[in-house]
Amino acid sequence: MKLNKPLVITAGEPAGIGPKLCSSLVNTNLLNEIVVIGDASLLDDKLKVIDTPFPAPVKAGCPDPRNAKTLLEGLEIAVKGCLSNKFSGMVTAPIAKNVIADAGISFTGHTEFLANLTNVDFPVMLLVANNLRVALASTHIPLRDVPDFITKERLIKILCVLQEDLKRKFQIKSPEILVCGLNPHAGESGHIGKEDEEIIAPVVKELAKSGMKVRGPISADTAFTAASGHKDAILA
């Protein structure tokens, strides 16, 4: 799809693969203009670049916490450009979260960082590949904390946000959503964990009764197979 304004790409961790990925775009026949935010000395000079030089020397494979602040400033430039309609959208190259944390900066991931910059109280991460759309019920938290994180209130909010965005951003008039179970085989009727039976199933039932086309909990090992039938999105 041809966009009216350029896409902005943040080059990510300077010691990682991001700058090389961005530089490879000069040999690609892109439909839209792109602008890259990063250290110009690490990027192909044919790219249109907003230069954000890093204070510490960059060595491939050896991220330096001294560069973390500049990296995040590049993300802020991209977000402000999108909010001011300078850019049509943004793409983020990989970063090293641990290096940012080592710099003493509170950072759990792009999702939460962008939500904070855009004053979004309840961000929902959606992964999209062609017609496969997967929303996540949790993002950057330890696995041991996930069961306590999956509450009825949270699931209802996520599913309502997902339904609305499928309508508004993907022009799907009446989206159908599958909800994955939390435990193996969606809990086997409560024999492998109680969350699917006590939390997920009641939420699905309540929203389905209100008119939402939602089904679950579905065992995660079968939700992505053709046998599950075509659905517009999966909540996992």
What are these regions (language model features)?
Residues 49, 123-125, 134, 234:
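Conserved beta-strand scaffold positions in the cores of enzyme catalytic domains, especially
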Residues 111-121:
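A glycine-rich helix N-cap at a beta->alpha junction
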Residues 44, 127-157:
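Ligand-binding beta-strand-loop-alpha-helix segment within the catalytic cores
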Residues 1-110, 149, 153-236:
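Contiguous, glycine/small-aliphatic-enriched amphipathic segments in soluble metabolic enzymes
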